[in-house]
Amino acid sequence: MEWQTRFSPLNLSTQDALPELSISLLDNLGMITMVGDDKKSYLHGQVTCDVVSLEKDQSMLGAHCDAKGKVWSVFRLFHHNDGYAMVQPKSAIEVELKEIKKYAVFSKVTIEESSDIVLGVAGENADAFISTLNADSGEVRTVEGGTAVKVASNRWLLALTAEAAQSLLEDSQATLTTHELWTRFDIEAALPYVAADAQNEHIPQALNVQALGGISFTKGCYTGQETVARAKYRGTNKRAMYIVKGATAEALGEGAIELERSVGENWRSVGALLTHYQFSDNQAMGLIVLPNNLDDDTRLRLVTQPECEWEIAALPYSLDDE
């Protein structure tokens, strides 16, 4: 679509001010939608969050697991059109769609990948901008061609038809940028990002889903519940997701970015970043799952750039269950 060429990368240093209003084309994200008479009961029985309690003007995070409690997807759930929408990394959807539909034949529900465009609106003028589309006070609002969803202070997702997205941008004075800026905001908020290469690797608590209100321990049965409950009540989970940051000698590539941690005089692999953001002044940040007993001052380094040491940064929330 020609209008999408208006979005361009925004190269920012660690010292640069952020735009007062930016709209990011989130082509790295997609949506699974669910409609039908049984949508609520079916989804409630598949995921970690309390779907039944979700109000029309709210969104929530949740996870979908396999029978062993390993995560297929972490998503943001909200009411959209006549059903639900689950926003998540686009690369995860092929597998997640197959898994979430596995038992749907027994229910009156239609589950499919949405063709809607996902945009991210951010900046100190974001709330005012959304209010021009719908002046209601809710954190989820119906707008022309779709839905607006508040995800944080001064940050909104827009799920729109292509026609509505194009119309919205025709006279916009916002900075139009690609998805990397939104990724930065998600990293700073420590919001889990489970792309295809991280599926079926971690339980929800290792991705901090419980700390973000994405696990209900009172809702009843769902796929993988036994493992998730055991991690809480028996303390079997030994991992958590952290923000890490440090210097780069050269730009980080798009492939797996592996880190090592210091162990005495040696270095030991700790895994790959779930996602990352590259600043223009040779600094970067990312999210990674690490052992949850590491000291805050544990030394880390990039495997491919061993001269570049990284550190663990503070999370913006407690890891306790909410």
UniProtKB/Swiss-Prot annotation:
Q: Sorted alphabetically, which keywords does the UniProt record give?
A: Cytoplasm, Folate-binding, tRNA processing
Q: Where in the cell is it found?
A: Cytoplasm
Note the InterPro entries from the entry. GcvT/YgfZ_C, tRNA-modifying_YgfZ, YgfZ/GcvT, YgfZ/GcvT_CS, YgfZ_barrel
Q: Which residues bind folate?
A: 182
SUPFAM superfamilies per the record?
A: Aminomethyltransferase beta-barrel domain, Folate-binding domain
Please report which protein family the annotation says this sequence is part of: Belongs to the tRNA-modifying YgfZ family.
Function, as annotated, reads: Folate-binding protein involved in regulating the level of ATP-DnaA and in the modification of some tRNAs. It is probably a key factor in regulatory networks that act via tRNA modification, such as initiation of chromosomal replication.
What is the name of this protein? tRNA-modifying protein YgfZ
